[in-house]
């Protein structure tokens, strides 16, 4: 889908979630080379000029968080051949997103906060060297709000369950990278969600087709299982 628009002129103006969440950066990195780098950087700059002063969409839901995550994770690629001036602009855009994410986090109701928001907020607090500790109890409450007592994501959709579990792993890795203690709630949630996810696989490796279940997503879901053991073995 991203391939269908990424080479179009001014694609940053297209009203698509793949544009507004900056997922195109991941495609551009795979594309690589000067074309991919220039395409990514200039699209971010143009998008920001167009949308920075808007109040609602595309600053709604968790789009701000997803853009921030994609920019940070692709930072080296985006800036690999940047001038000092271009790098300064990139940093300003990222900083703008951090402050916007923090503002939205305080304003959102607890059931409106996604696992992508948790990653974005954690990155923002730690990079900006703000007090992460005072947010831990609230983050624990957010996790509790989204997982039931059996360790199942409350969407009761295996794909959403796997996405949430993946993001908890990512949250843990970020905290470890910044030498920050991982809350027990995150550790325990990873353990119980892994255990619950294992229960849903048939003996032939397929998943039950209910409430969004789709065997096209089996690899994504299986990739979430026991990721802890995989990462320790690397």
Protein language model regions, located:
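Aromatic-lined, polymer-binding surfaces characteristic
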Residues: 14-190
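Extreme N-terminal leader/anchor segments
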Residues: 1-13
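Carbohydrate-active enzyme catalytic cores, enriched for enzymes
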Residues: 152-234
């Amino acid at each position: 889908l991203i391939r269908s628009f990424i080479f179009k002129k001014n694609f940053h103006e297209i009203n698509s979630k793949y544009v507004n969440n900056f997922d195109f950066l991941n495609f551009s990195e795979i594309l690589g080379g000067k074309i991919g780098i220039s395409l990514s950087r200039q699209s971010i700059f143009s998008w920001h000029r167009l949308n920075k002063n808007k109040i609602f969409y595309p600053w709604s839901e968790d789009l701000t968080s997803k853009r921030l995550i994609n920019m940070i994770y692709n930072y080296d690629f985006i800036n690999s051949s940047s001038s000092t001036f271009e790098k300064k602009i990139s940093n300003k855009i990222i900083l703008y997103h951090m402050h916007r994410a923090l503002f939205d986090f305080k304003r959102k109701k607890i059931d409106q906060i996604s696992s992508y928001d948790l990653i974005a907020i954690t990155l923002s607090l730690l990079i900006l060297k703000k007090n992460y500790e005072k947010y831990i109890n609230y983050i624990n409450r957010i996790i509790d709000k989204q997982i039931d007592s059996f360790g199942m994501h409350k969407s009761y959709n295996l794909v959403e369950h796997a996405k949430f579990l993946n993001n908890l792993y990512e949250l843990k890795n970020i905290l470890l990278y910044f030498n920050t203690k991982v809350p027990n709630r995150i550790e325990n949630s990873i353990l119980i969600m892994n255990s619950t996810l294992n229960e849903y696989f048939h003996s032939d490796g397929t998943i039950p087709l209910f409430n969004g279940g789709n065997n096209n997503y089996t690899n994504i879901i299986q990739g979430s299982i026991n990721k802890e053991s995989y990462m320790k073995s690397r």
